[in-house]
Swiss-Prot record:
ATP binds at K18, T46, K47, D48, D66, D89, G137, H138, S139. Belongs to the selenophosphate synthase 1 family. Class I subfamily. InterPro entries: PurM-like_C_dom, PurM-like_C_sf, PurM-like_N, PurM-like_N_sf, SelD_I, SPS/SelD. It comes from Colwellia psychrerythraea (strain 34H / ATCC BAA-681). GO terms for biological process: selenocysteine biosynthetic process. This is Selenide, water dikinase. Its cofactor is Mg(2+). The active site is at C15.
Amino acid sequence: MTSIRLTQYSHGAGCGCKISPSVLDVMLKSSLALPVNDALLVGNSTKDDAAVFDIGNDQGVISTTDFFMPIVDDPTDFGKIAACNAISDIYAMGGKPIMAIAILGWPVNLLAPEIAQQVLDGARAICAEAGIPLAGGHSIDAPEPIFGLAVTGLINNAHIKRNNTAEVGDLLYLTKPLGIGIMTTAEKQGKLLPEHAQLAPQAMKTLNVIGQKFAELEVVTAMTDVTGFALLGHLLEMCQGSGVAAVIDFEQVPRLDFVNDYIDQGCVPGGCERNFISYGEHVGPLSPKQKILLCDPQTSGGLLVAVKPQGKEAFEALCQENGLNLQPIGELVAATSPTVSLLS
């Protein structure tokens, strides 16, 4: 076990490094006409998880990239988490990953190259678990450690799961518990108890491979993964893109054990407030704890899945077959204001 604390070498952590949604919207605005290409099935106009390009014979190639600063101190775990997080975008589209290349920024005058080697070994382990090669990459000398992957995948075009095709009446499911940003903030503040040290990393190192199986279900109308914009942010993207609203049962939202204890100790990521400022106007009243948990930036978070109500039994049965015991966390309703509200 290394004595290096990687989180002390970066100003951000994991997907909490993301630029806020409101600022990103300004950056991505352009007066240039977008090129028309009918083969581009999914681009950046819908804020989806990855791009999909039609390559013929009902097949699409999926392309995505994701990288960030350390969210844990252990280099191998950092590599595993970053790899899981990047590959997740392929699964969120319903696809199968086939190859990855690494993106590495490293402060070579501050951190030994052997530590970067451990990061890469962690990524290789996850790529092997996903059945894909880490086939290359690019590195630069950077003031802070940064790592991630660019990932390529394949998909049957009929099975593409977008984030803007949900329907009124759909049930909402979340495949991983919330609280990752809160727990990793507790670690950075030195408040995390040793017996809780693996709660967040274990979730973050779990591949969202079940997304491939969800893609084969017609009753799954939309899917995305929950990362830096938190559950509320990614749910809002789904609702606004689909022209619907959502009602969430807060008590049914899964969360990591002991997360409320760390909220009480003030272990709140800076990204919580940035997220709420960006989209809070579209959300109904929240208690302080509800706001923190629902706006908590997730790294390598779970899949948010919209399921037709008549598909509830089949969907939950598939989940149970794959070790997931899921219950609906809410449902989609006709568009209204606020776009997302909590069950009273």
